[in-house]
């Protein structure tokens, strides 16, 4: 063998150029390489001889093709550098998971991903992982250690290698020596086949050299089979002793020797098994596997293994198959050894670095190609399969070496991992392999045919270069995927082949192998079963292979026995640690292996889900995508060998560069794949996606995560494998795109999207790869279009199918660390605490949180809820958190992320409902929104989220999330939804995100889970959010359940919240939706959702939990809640949570919004249109106004405030008009004022929806009553304004501020709803007329005059007037409530009269303007969808901000406690937060109780403030129906309101209390909320008047 290897080395050197063309002829020879002397026919003959002769032609091939193969190997090495860890880890994960079990997989994954060649060298015991790592690790080490050299060599040899890859593959296949010769050769770059090194491999030197170079390789062989290396050598040497040794001698100089030595080392490991098999089989194996060392010894065996798996008895067929059974260990060891050999070879030679890179890329390419190669080899012909499979695997040795170890476990996963990874490329690859297998031309064959002029050589070689480019990253995923398949096949199929080591001649093996491998590839579970069975049933070979497999997987004995260089204890002891070291080079992905480990632990099948996330890492995913797409493009034509050859030749010409045509093809493939994914998502082919996608998911995801997250996962090898590095994972930034893929793929929400995609795409693998990477990463930067859709479906499918919730977790988060990272990242998108029920989880699934998110998504996959425990743990703890927040987090992710998988276990019903509505849209949007939202959270919580989104979400996610995440769509850029927050967040399913079923289920699951998970994970105070989450069930109902969930959803799950907001803003569910948000924010309060007063009281009482949650969630609603909640309160009252929700939201607003207010106020000083800044600026401005007001800047601040607030008012009037319109439904029932406003909006909304008649009547009556009421209120308001002339402007500003706050979460609302706001302004003027007493003035009263007037009557605080106003507000808002309740008519009138007296002229005129604006707004209500959209966006932005901030209530409280005293004093009396406006109006009405409505009516004459308001709101202030009819609702006794509407008084109290923190300057409610409420209170006062007018008329 040595001589043959030397010969091959020499020949490779000499024949490098020779075999470039020969590679074309070589594949044809490969079919005939069964026993023909390969040497005799350099071209076709090379691949022909399987036995002794095979070596010489192989040698020639390696000489001629060796460099090319090494170039290819290097290309693959590069890929492996990118995807080595992936494949390695994936293999480890897959194999361990499938063959050994979750724990084993865990170790193996960690080791593989973690430890590259060093690991392989050091660990003989964990041969499988080491084998995989050997391939990956070696490649990785090549890439990392000798990156430049390996890369250079790869590039150098890439063209040659491409051509020669097939030749080398064939030759290598024929020459068993190549792996040995190639592995030993130190000159991975100089001579691909280093004769000296391979000589070491040859004979007994193989072991020493394996030890020296690839300890893992050799000690794999040694551990599992002491004579494995020797037997392989003997096998190689026996049949091809002279030639192979000669080749080996020749090879060392050649770079292919390194690759082939690697493969040979693997073959040595597997070669022992081969030795156990038969000489012919060994020849084949050596030809198929030993040649692999140049490319990837393991890949060659996978090819063989695939063949043998297909033809497990025919392990002999390619030797690769024979080697496959030992490959799981042997191939793994070989992989590691090969990699280490390559590394060792590479280390000596500067080229070796390059070669290593090249080999890594080559490994990647080969890994993919190995899938193809194995398929191709199987397809091609027995001889050709031997040569081709061996040759392809050899060519793909770097790539396929891992592929082989992974193939046995991953043949099952191949369908999953490969699908996932080949989603773009591997989808076609998978399809093509299946087709090719069926047609007899495997992917490898196609590749070889394409690449090599000859059937296999041409296909393979060009493909190797192109795949090297394309699959460099893809290859790791695909390679892992293929490797996973190979490994599955190896244990299953190769084990069987090993069982029949004597399985007859390579040709026979080859013949059967195609058949059996075909089924295995086609049936990944069969492959897995075979792998399991074969791994177990391999008695003689299994001794070595079992030892190797156990060692490889568990790294049991040999690892500790041979932990030479890396860190023998760690590498030996912990496969995880082994994975860690490789992480350096390509260990970014390897993280996913630890995730897989966690997954494995959590779920029996950690294999399938893990791969998707690991595979679908951002870099890997993108590259994978390109490669896969290129490969797909090639594969589709690849079925036709000539076409494939031509295509691949083209690409071979551009080794590292994809032809424009190829890129176009890839893009086309991506587009088609995306379409397929979307179609599949739509079709919701969850069973296909589940079955086909679940295993492949694991491989790609695991590989990607392993590579990306492997290091951090490895930080805590034992115990906290994932946690250790998961939180501070670097890949987080990188992971988010892949996190999205993995997130999506991993998270069931992503699988939801991906699932429909799965059927269209290769139902199994493409769904994850194409869906998650292609569909999910659009947002994740991987899939522009279906970022969060694809992966989730895949993962969801996986979980549904395998119930691999843990698997999906591992997919998103391989280890706990990664899981946490994924969850963290995914949940970062939707901050676990605040945005727990936001798609943010999904967004970040692909990264650190990808694991958690992936499980969340997987949870979304309904089927995977159980496995969500592992996911949940990712964010907080490995398993503990997952199980803790598995329900809330998982479910939340479940719900929030599109749960495409109908098989989602607990949330299936809701998920299915949502799935229909929100599956793909929600996935994409959720991922987008969550990703966006969580990205800010990532900044805040980079630790947890960094790892996750590197999911996303791929992973979160992100496949996560891909996975969130998916999901880093909504939450990450959540704050940036200024004008288009809705589009950003709800880009796809904006309207579809409001399906009641989806939100119904989602809110509960999402909110609770998000609150639990996010709060626990991300926040120090998760309980309160959790409470809200728990009560989020209300979110389920768009109007009422959603109120809790909806409000919570905005920040928690923007989509849900947005839909609710949109519903609230839209005519359909204007108030309920927004109320949902409010309630959702006050979900804990929402328990007493039924009685608004109770709820308010509860809200107030529950301030700690509910108010804090509100402070968290309601902060975003704060602006909208101040205004919107007031408007929403009437509707909220019907939901029976409006008051509490508002108060809670108000309080929350004070906390969260205060921070944002000041922050954003400074940032946004004049940018009122910024949705995220809406609340911040309005609140900040209101706070400034409030502070200045409180600071006796009565007119000074109003002047300043008037200017600023004038802008704000104009903007807010627009946004508030829309906000109010949507909220009016809430307001209608909450307060007469709010009810009036809400009634009008509700009317408009009902005009759209069903409630149009009564709300319209209410609005009409309100407008009618608002005429007189408006006169009174105007007078009152004008009085207040006259008191503070700028107060009129301030009132405008307050209205604007209220509106702005209301739309703070709806940044776009303001701009979009300017027209609607005009209408709303008029409407509000009408409402103000109705609520004339307090509405304009309270908002102006936010100005010190109005506020002080109110305070004067109420409480002697800083704002004396505001205090009386607050008292009046407490008394009067109940009057509007009574109006709403029918008891408030007199009260409203009386209160309105008094308030109107106070705010007579200016307020009345302002109210008139508001009425006009409301009238316009009524018109615009038809256009309410725009405003609804904006409001939803604004609310979502607010919630997103809250979620990002996380310390919403704390911030709130910090922000406004000083103003709270006034408000808190009145807060108890204060009505619901909705009453903030309503209270403002009633308070302002009651502020001057002596002022009768008549006086207020005259006060309305005051045009100063009215002129100002009209000037401010001139747009909105078109001629409105401002008939100031005496406010009938106002006449009702003002005192009764508080007692008569106990719900409202309670609500006002809660609201006031909430508002107290928010606007202390306002009346009770307005005091704390005064900062946010100056305008908001204006709006609320107006709304109260409106609501009072409308509701007093509607209700009375």
Swiss-Prot record:
The modification N6-acetyllysine is found at residue 817. One of its GO terms (cellular component) is nucleoplasm. Keywords: Acetylation, Disease variant, DNA-binding, Intellectual disability, Nucleus, Repeat. Expressed in numerous tissues. Expressed at low levels in myeloid and monocytic cells as well as in CD34+ cells; expression levels are higher in myeloid malignancies. Residues 1-12, 213-236, 270-282, 375-395, 779-796, 854-880 have a biased composition (Polar residues). Residues 1520-1546, 1560-1572 have a biased composition (Pro residues). Changing residue 880 to A: In myeloid malignancies. Changing residue 880 to E: In myeloid malignancies. GO terms for molecular function: DNA binding; histone H3K4 methyltransferase activity. It comes from the Eukaryota. The keyword Repressor does not apply. It is found in: Nucleus. Residues 64-81, 363-372 have a biased composition (Basic and acidic residues). Changing residue 870 to S: In SGMFS, ACML, MDS and AML; somatic mutation in ACML and other myeloid malignancies; results in higher protein levels; cells expressing this mutant exhibit higher proliferation rates than those expressing the wild-type protein. Residues 584-596, 1016-1028, 1451-1463 bind DNA. Residues 1-83, 134-426, 475-518, 604-624, 722-763, 777-796, 854-889, 1134-1164, 1202-1225, 1245-1300, 1325-1344, 1440-1473, 1518-1596 are annotated as: Disordered. Changing residue 874 to N: In myeloid malignancies. Changing residue 869 to N: In MDS and myeloid malignancies. Residues 164-175, 290-306 have a biased composition (Low complexity). Disulfide bonds: none annotated. InterPro entries: AT_hook_DNA-bd_motif. One of its GO terms (biological process) is regulation of DNA-templated transcription. Interacts with SET. It is linked to Schinzel-Giedion midface retraction syndrome: A disorder characterized by severe intellectual disability, distinctive facial features, and multiple congenital malformations including skeletal abnormalities, genitourinary and renal malformations, cardiac defects, as well as a higher-than-normal prevalence of tumors, notably neuroepithelial neoplasia. This is SET-binding protein.
